[in-house]
Amino acid sequence: MKYFTHILLFLVLLLTGCGDKEKLSGKVVFSDGQPLTTGTIYFTNNNYTARAHLRENGTYDVGSLSERDGLPAGTYKVYISGAIENNADPTDETMRLLIAPEFASESKTPLTITVPGERVYNITVERPQPVKKPPR
């Protein structure tokens, strides 16, 4: 009986932490309207982190433990990881960031969202500034 009580108490505590979650989806595009076709978008605050993989058309559905399971109420920083492109030369291992660096940094991102709120959160990001090569 004691074992059953412990299991029941554990389940109650576990389910208490599972509040209502809001379904959230959207699209990530550049300022020219072209979709960002690769990367993972993160929604994070002090208590919770959720992610979604971008599809080739730039759309996403938010999940924490699995895709599309939503976000609990709160304000979140939004940033994108893995938005990189391999160099066309297969012998060159360098990669190029497809978005401006501030959108790829949890500490520098200008993007935030408050949940509950809009259930569709479309995001516009900027491309990185071209790197100026020093004169020869």
Language model segments and positions:
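Sec-dependent bacterial lipoprotein signal peptides
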Residues: 1-16
